[in-house]
Structure formats: C-alpha cells, structure tokens
C-alpha cells in the first residue's frame, strides 16, 4: 500500500513539472497572456503552426507570397492566365517555320496511264525523285481537268470529252495531292451526274476542291488550310466554259466562273479578312499560246488589288510567262502536269512562305508516255532561258529561283517586297 501511494505521488509531481514546463514554453512563444485578473489564460491558435522540414522550407517560402490578400490572389490568377496564353519560344519559332506550297498544271488520267497504274502503281505516273518532291511539300495543288464518274453521256459536238472511273482517285492520293480546282472546260463533259460523283470521290479521299459544287455557294467557297501557323486560302474559277449553262446557280450544280471579275473579287476580299495568304487558281487563256491574253493580265491585277497573294493559271496546255504585280507573283499558265501520252517539258511552281517573304523556285519536269520525271540537269539552263524570254523583268538563277530585276517592267517594281528567292 505504501509502495502504491509513493507511485501516485511521483506521478503527480511529474505531471506538475510537465505542466510548468509547458506554461514556460507558452509564455516564451507569446501564446499565453496574463490578464489583469491575474488568471492565466492559454489562447490556442486557430491554425496549428508546424515547422517545416529543411527540404520543405524553401518551397513553402516560395508559396507564401502567393497566399496574400484577395487582390493579390486575383493578380496572381491573371498573371498565371497570361503565362498560359503566351506562346513559348518553341511555339513562336514553329509559327515562323517556312511553308512550302507546290502547284502543277492540268491533270488528266489517260487510258494508257490507268493501265500502267494497275500494273506498276504510282511509279507509272511519276518518278521516285519527283514523288519525293510532290509528297515533301506542305501542300500540293493541281487543276483536275476531268470528272470522276460512271454516269452520263458525252456532250454533243465537243471534240474531246473526259471521264475517269472514281476508283482512280487513288492516283491523286498516291501523288500527294491535297487540293484541286475543278473549274475548267471539261468538268461537265458528261453532265452534272459525274460532277456529283467527283465531289463524293474527292471528299472520300480527303482531297479538298474549289471552283465547282452542287450550287453556287459551294462552287465559290474558299477552302483553307492551317500550315505552320498560317491560314492559307484557296479559290478556283474558270474563264473558259463551253456553254453558259455550265455556271453554278443558287440551286443548281456547276462551276464558278470569272467572265465578270466582280464575284471572284468579292470572294477574294472576304478571304483576305481571315487568311494570311490567298491563292487564286484560274482556268483561262488560249490553248497552245505561250502569250497571255490581255484579259488575263487585267483579271490578274484585279485579283491582286482585291487581296490575292498569288495567281496561278492553267488551260493553254503550254507554259506562259511569270510576272510580279505589286510584289505578288502571277503564273499565267503552268502548262500540263500529267495529261497526254506525248512527250513535253513542263514545270512545277514552288512557293515558300517565310514571314512576309515569298520565295519562288521552278522545278523543271518532262513527261513521256504519261510518266512525269525531273528534267535532266544539263537541260535546265535552256529551260530557264526559254521561260525568261516569256517573262519580262524576271530573272531565274541556275537553281530555278525566281526574282524580279527590271524596274518598271510589266508592273514590276525595283526591290519588290516578297520577291526574294529562298536561301
């Protein structure tokens, strides 16, 4: 019993000593106030303060400044939003990366090409070296000078009427085609049925199209691509159709035409509002003529004055000259791409967009028995010289890069902005 009492007394003394030590700590920390009544009151803080570990101290110190007044919190939120919206250096750089647009002329898939394609694949249409260029561009555009279809009857009293089975749309995808213009003088050779089949075939293959549609709104519609931080817009129209009835209407299928420039000019002005670069592809001119008609020059200038950044032409089936107007390039005719069974020289036009500059490079080609390949290096100087003779005020260097050099020639200005070949 005595032993038990000693144990209780010792325990009580230990608790009193522990309580005294705790009060001393509270006084030192300022957690205990001594009111005038002389009674000691211990105020417990609403939030218990725990000293961080050394490894956590720096992180908590950094966060402390962010947990301030409501105004400071609002400012922090705004700063955080700004930081999220502001592009990183990597994003800014990617927005300035060059964009390569590649353009070819008239495309038709002859019976001979179709036969070879079934046996050899896409090598029947283009050489390996050319294919790498076609597929390597950010975007490839051609004039599709035929409808895909199996229905309809050929137009009476028309010398040449074209139609290709929709299954051969794979030729275009194999070539790397991204967009075609359908505004030309062969799209309704077999009536409006094949036009509907054409739109379906291209849509199914993921190939964009301009210049024709199920109604006028579709035919004149702008098609855009987002490439390298730029919005690139495309419009297509024809100045060559066999009959007025080929025109699209409010409720009828057909083509978008530009005999009167007003409608296309209006579309260009609308495109300028949302596009960084606008291309107008026009079917015009006289077949087999290497010189543009005066109306081609007039229309091209109207398009550029309205906001077009480049004008591409087709229909003559031969090359016509190049011109700069207000610093913007005009290719009056890119001739044939892959079109006939014969042998002929032609070219692709490569536009490189870098900032506000347009670098232009010509890629000479030769087509033989429907297969297109790069022109031999030894033949290129004569090719460039021939094209220069069709292009007053234009210089073409040994690599096919184009620049304007003669002040005042054909609307060309000295030191034309944008007429700077890519390095």
Where are these regions (language model features)?
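N-terminal Lys/Arg-rich, disordered targeting/topogenic segments
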Residues: 1-12
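Acidic, metal/ion-coordinating pockets
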Residues: 11, 15-59, 68-71, 77-79, ...
